[in-house]
A protein has these predicted regions:
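Flavin-dependent oxidoreductase catalytic core characteristic
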Residues: 1-164
């Protein structure tokens, strides 16, 4: 049902998505995109292989990568939001930075794994159609992971350990 709902959404075109506010609004958008990409990848794989999907180890591995990244991204977001609620945005700056960094890396992993699944499960016109759907689902502004990573590193070096 979730895959069918996603495919209906994809075929109907862009919709007015729920806009979140706060320091992690962009990361919530990335999480939603990662979920959609994962459902799309699962749909592509199940459509192609049906009952034989369990025999496609590389496809199953790529799907597992997507699922793990979605789970970890959501866990990271929820933990950061909990810290923001408890300590305030300023005191949770390190958690916000780490969440931004991880979300940027995770969406790239999900997108790459989805491409791998599409390449293994489709060909010809269907392949091109599914790639265009992937591009639409994976629209996001890339984060400056270099600056964010340096900010995290400075904080860790100053404290002599990870601080959260």
């Amino acid at each position: 049902p979730a895959i069918k709902k996603l495919m209906d959404e994809v075929m109907s075109g862009p919709s007015a998505a729920e806009e979140r506010e706060g320091p992690l609004a962009a990361e919530h958008h990335l999480l939603a995109a990662a979920r959609k990409l994962t459902l799309f990848a699962a749909g592509v794989a199940s459509q192609r292989y049906m009952q034989a999907l369990a025999d496609q180890q590389e496809i199953m591995g790529a799907l597992a990568d997507c699922i793990m990244e979605v789970f970890a991204m959501e866990s990271c977001l929820l933990r950061a939001e909990k810290l923001i609620a408890a300590r305030g945005e300023g005191a949770a700056a390190q958690a916000i930075a780490m969440t931004r960094y991880y979300a940027a890396k995770a969406i790239a992993t999900v997108e790459h794994s989805t491409r791998k699944i599409i390449a293994g499960a489709a060909e010809g016109d269907m392949f091109r159609t599914q790639l265009s759907i992937l591009r639409r689902l994976a629209k996001y502004e890339p984060a400056d992971t270099i600056s964010i990573g340096r900010q995290i590193a400075r904080s860790v070096m100053a404290a002599g350990r990870y601080t959260l």
